[in-house]
Amino acid sequence: YKISTENNIDYGLVNKDFKGSTNISVVSNNKKYKQLTIGIGDEYKIINRFPSITTAFSRSNYVRSQNIETAYRTELLNGLYSEFKFLYCFQTPIDNLDLSSDWFTSLDSVAELAAINFDPYRKMETRIQLTWLPFQKFYYKKNRKVVLGTKFPTINLIYRKGIPKLFKSEVNFDYLELGINDEFPIPHLGKSKWNFQLGSFINNKNLRVIEWKYFRGSD
């Protein structure tokens, strides 16, 4: 077994607030890969990870998230991995922060951007992901499986469910996504990557703006 931890700490000088997160993972690679992770945090999180240049640093793209999560990842068959994740969080806007001395406040004013205002809410979400690496090569070193990878594209199937009412959760949605990606070398230049994703909300009865699926903004 291998135990690892990841910790992040932030401190806002103007608002005098500590924020951060911590998680601990237990990994076993005896014959097949298994990993259990538990984490907790209070952070300012990005809403849209594919913004245009104008909104990349805008405070309108952030929200406060107090969260706790757990995830379990394992190899079902050679090259076929599954991950089960549960996330519970309390989402609140940051419109009550003092941003008068923030470097990007003037940019937000010019672009007429403001921190998103919404009613705080609780969210319970489960996420299931299947990842297939076709014809994955490997070998055993004692009882440890050493993965060499595959020369074929990686296929991902993701299902997200916003669970209503559980622990006062206020969301209700279902999202399904299929993705294919690959990385390949280019002689004398390095590596290149491509990624194709196709997804849709098959249920959006109670879908908040933070849970929307965003596309890359135009620059």
What would you call each of these model-derived segments?
Residues 6-12, 27, 39-43, 85-91, ...:
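Outer-membrane beta-barrel pore domains and translocons
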Residues 36-41, 51-61, 116, 158-219:
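C-terminal outer-membrane beta-barrel translocator/porin domains of Gram-negative envelope proteins
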Residues 1, 9, 22-28, 40, ...:
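Residues on the lipid-exposed face of transmembrane beta-strands in outer-membrane beta-barrel proteins
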Residues 2-5, 30-36, 78-82, 92, ...:
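Repeated loop/turn-to-beta-strand initiation elements of outer-membrane beta-barrel proteins
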Residues 16-20, 62-68, 120-126, 172-176:
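Residues that define the transmembrane beta-barrel architecture of outer-membrane proteins
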Residues 1-10, 42-45, 136-182:
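Surface-exposed extracellular loop regions of Gram-negative outer-membrane beta-barrel proteins
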Residues 14-18, 45-49, 91-97, 137-141, ...:
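Outer-membrane beta-barrel proteins
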Residues 3-7, 34-38, 82-84, 128, ...:
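Transmembrane beta-strands of outer-membrane beta-barrel proteins
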